[in-house]
């Protein structure tokens, strides 16, 4: 099947859900993706946004489609489904208004060219469960992620920030 809008889409990750649906994610320059009723972000915010969508197991019906991003550029690089069917995402953004949530590691853009982001959407694409920047004064890019169950989320990427947030261990 085909999926997309008037410009270009880049597919970065896809997984089958526990019930056989196909969940996929990437980034787009199209402002007319077929977002669905109840989508977390039904409208394109500009300059390249992430997207997350799902098809039924036969690929014949779009279950949901939502954008994810701010007014700048978002490159969504990886996606995993957690044990509850929620959608965990990583990538990079240069948006100063990327959607973040209370209580996360970093609610404010760190500076430089771009920051890494990690976000979690509900399994139906209707709610942002959390969103955070991870970055310092340089460029910071999230490429891959692994879910570690109760231990958290492991994100790999690249940085040239000398003040990138690190842990002691």
Listing of model-derived features with the role each one plays in the protein:
Residues 1-169:
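A sequence-level/structural motif corresponding to short, flexible coil/turn segments enriched
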């Amino acid at each position: 099947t085909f999926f997309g809008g008037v410009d270009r889409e880049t597919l970065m990750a896809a997984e089958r859900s526990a019930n056989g649906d196909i969940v996929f994610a990437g980034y787009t320059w199209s402002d007319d993706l077929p977002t669905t009723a109840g989508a977390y972000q039904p409208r394109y915010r500009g300059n390249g946004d992430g997207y997350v969508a799902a098809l039924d197991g036969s690929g014949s019906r779009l279950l949901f489609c939502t954008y994810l991003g701010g007014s700048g550029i978002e490159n969504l690089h990886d996606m995993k489904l957690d044990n509850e069917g929620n959608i965990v995402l990583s990538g990079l953004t240069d948006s100063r208004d990327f959607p973040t949530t209370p209580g996360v590691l970093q609610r404010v853009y760190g500076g430089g060219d771009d920051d890494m982001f990690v976000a979690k959407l509900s399994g139906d694409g209707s709610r942002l469960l959390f969103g955070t920047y991870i970055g310092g004064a340089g460029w910071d890019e999230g490429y891959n992620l692994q879910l570690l169950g109760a231990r958290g989320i492991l994100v790999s990427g690249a940085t040239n920030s000398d003040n990138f947030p690190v842990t002691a261990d």
